[in-house]
A protein has these predicted regions:
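TRAFAC-class small GTPase G-domain
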Residues: 1-170
């Protein structure tokens, strides 16, 4: 299937928040229980058809460790959507979101759609970041917001379609 449009999405955030599983869930509809740190970047692509037009969605999973930050910054260029991910059960990953958002605003096109993603809602009993905190941060920074459970794919595909539709309309 030949595509008409190439759209680049990036996934950013601290290490171990679920970025690699977000890529795996969207591209292959799978979840990997075994954690491994991304070294540099990982990449996946998928063609989708909307209103008779074929879009190739490239999703770039960036390393969350500070060691690789200078390498991963190069991948912000030409992104149409940035998923900024944190772990709802790990306060530090939310506290670090500000720096990821600043990088995104500085290095991505001005038109980039930013989506704040609170992951691991299956760990509700260990929640350290309230839904309200995430929602307020997203509003203040002009971002869309969602909480997901990548383990089951809850909300992810529906939300990726919403982000894509928003881009297509604009």
């Amino acid at each position: 299937m030949n595509f008409l449009y190439l759209l680049k999405f990036i996934i950013i955030g601290d290490s171990a928040v679920g970025k690699s599983n977000m890529l795996l869930r969207y591209i292959h509809d799978r979840f990997n229980e075994d954690f491994h740190s991304t070294i540099g970047v990982e990449f996946g692509a998928k063609n989708i058809q909307i209103d008779g037009k074929v879009f190739r969605i490239q999703i770039w999973d960036t390393a969350g460790q500070e060691t690789f930050r200078s390498i991963t910054r190069a991948y912000y260029k030409n992104s149409v959507c940035a998923f900024v991910v944190y772990d709802i059960s790990n306060r530090a990953t939310f506290d670090n979101i500000k720096s990821w958002v600043e990088d995104c605003k500085r290095l991505s096109p001005k038109t980039v759609l930013m989506v704040l993603v609170g992951n691991k809602i299956d760990l509700e009993e260990r929640r350290e970041v309230s839904y309200n905190e995430g929602s307020i941060f997203a509003q203040k920074n002009g971002m869309l917001f969602l909480n997901v459970r990548l383990k089951l794919g809850i909300m992810l595909n529906k939300f990726l379609w919403k982000a894509l539709e928003k881009f297509i309309k604009e």
